[in-house]
Amino acid sequence: MAAATRVEGAGSAGGGSESARVLIYSHDTFGLGHLRRSRAIANALVTDRPGVSVVIISGSPVIGNFEFGSGVDYVRVPGVVKLPNGDYRSLNLNVELDEAVGLRAAIIQQTADTFGPDLVIVDKEPTGFRGEIVPALERLKERGTRIVLGVRDVMDEPALLVPEWERKGAVDALAAYYDETWVYGLREIYEPLSGLALPGEVRQRIAYTGYLRRSLPQEPGFMRYPKSTKGPFILLTTGGGGDGDDLIDWVISAYETDAGLDLPAVIVFGPFINRDRRRSFAERIARHPKLDAIAFDTKLEYLMNRATAVVAMGGYNTFCEVLSLDKPALIVPRTSPRLEQYIRAMHAERLGLVRMLVDDEAERDPARMAAALRALPAQKRPSQVIVPGLLDGLDVIQRRFAGWLAERPRRIAISEAAE
């Protein structure tokens, strides 16, 4: 009876069966990708649903810079940051990592207890960072909360993903706590969990949604873009910027070497770029008439929509934006410490959606990049390739959410009848 009472009372913010509370745990130890994906899903869930409230839990230091839809808010936990050697440390607090994780876990559990979500969506990590969400998952499961794991289209190559998930107890957690797994991609492109020894019932609960379509935001009223954006230009984005130094350097070198490149380039550094590297890049850019740069743009979709073509590393969110805004794209994926971007770019190039240029340090020839940039504007757009369901991700999530909302009264009635 307790579970039935909780579900009936959970949606106090709105009316009828459309009232619901959703908690999203956004993995946040590196870059912007997880936060931006969680934000897109949260905004979709509250669209035309005034009774739905979504809380995002994140440790991202820039979450406050983003706009969220009505009904969406966030709780920021103390941040952690991934170091170049693969270790982690507390981002701002002068405490040991274990203490920071303990504090994060306590805030997560308190938020879950107080907010009382009907649905929980966990991004990427079934146990969270260092197992921090497991205590909350145990209590949520006892209350009958529906729990979903959401993963991007590509995690990593199986040889690395399998031991990582074994070490974290991720498969056991997936079987114990989760009702569904949503893959934000297409099975025809890649199966991110195929190498894992998942129980049959877990594998049956995997749903492929398609990629998450991005809509065009309103024009930023406070953002001043370079003059070069008033005409045709190439946009270079490395996402958060924490690992995009080599690509930025390669593109700048191409312009410095080849005066015949027609289109100017606008480079978005990202908020996590190394300060010294950014200063060095800015000096080189200032000396070149066809190069401009901006630090960071929370409405990158607007700038990308104005661009003629895009150069990027091919993280999940940028890939979704390239597809949604239908831009010819040159993807230069990183190949360490994960092969995620390379695998995505390889399969996307196979379908003709993008062109890939592998960043081999030994062959990082400016002339090679210049040739790729010169060919980019004439490259076909993603929409010229027909892939059914390619950008249906948010629509599928909304339909599954709506179906679950419609089923709740029936499930409550069954629960009460059983009592």
Residue spans for each PLM region:
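C-terminal amphipathic helix plus adjacent low-complexity
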Residues: 2-10, 14, 366-419
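Conserved nucleotide-sugar donor-interacting segment of glycosyltransferase catalytic cores
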Residues: 109-175
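A nucleotide-sugar donor-handling region in carbohydrate enzymes
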Residues: 152-246, 272-275
